[in-house]
Amino acid sequence: DRSLLSDGERLLAHILNTIDFHSDITVTRGILDVLDHSSPQPLYGSKIAIDATARIAGEQPRPKTNAAKVSRGDEELLQHLRGIDRGFVALRRIFPGCKNPLLLIAIDKENGKNSRYYMDRIDWEALSQGVCVLYDAGIDLADDSLLLWKVFNNTDSSRDVTISGAGIIIDATKKGPADGHIRPWPDEIEMTDEIKKRVNGLLDEFVKDDPDALNMAAFRLPPLLRQPHLARR
């Protein structure tokens, strides 16, 4: 369905409702761009491919699974996690009605705690099935553009994607020696207000003669995630 490519909300819902974590995800290793910073070593690392197409004759059918049962509200779920460890600092759930709902969690990796520490403490019985993405505590879980940037740029698939039963965890946090990552991690790029204004002006100029450009998935994807999130109080 080509129309999915111009409707980010439908596209993401389709992926979450379609994929089987055990048969639709392929991780490869090979040469990476020189600008990559997330792989353990320069110029070499992992890439991920996800098959969200319909199965055809001759292919093994996907296992039939029901939509995840959400037994806890977001506030209750956050407090449950914080009862396990206070380092779980914020939570945001998206598409709870999908077969594989999306759960974003911010974690505090200070005091020697690494990502694996939190992964081992995520209670899948409480979280049910779905996709769980871990972010650093300073990341605003309401900033859709930043969330997408981090999950695409802070991950090496062979290290940062963990499949556990009916769930999958993606570690989109910064990596350091505590995570076994020895390479320097680049600082955040900060733009001045002047640069932001200029970039927004260029975008306005780009779309003014082609209103349909705003229907591109690249522009439509971030707004689809705009739902409330919870943070520690």
Task: Give short role names for the model-derived ranges.
Residues 1-233:
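Charged, compositionally biased interaction regions
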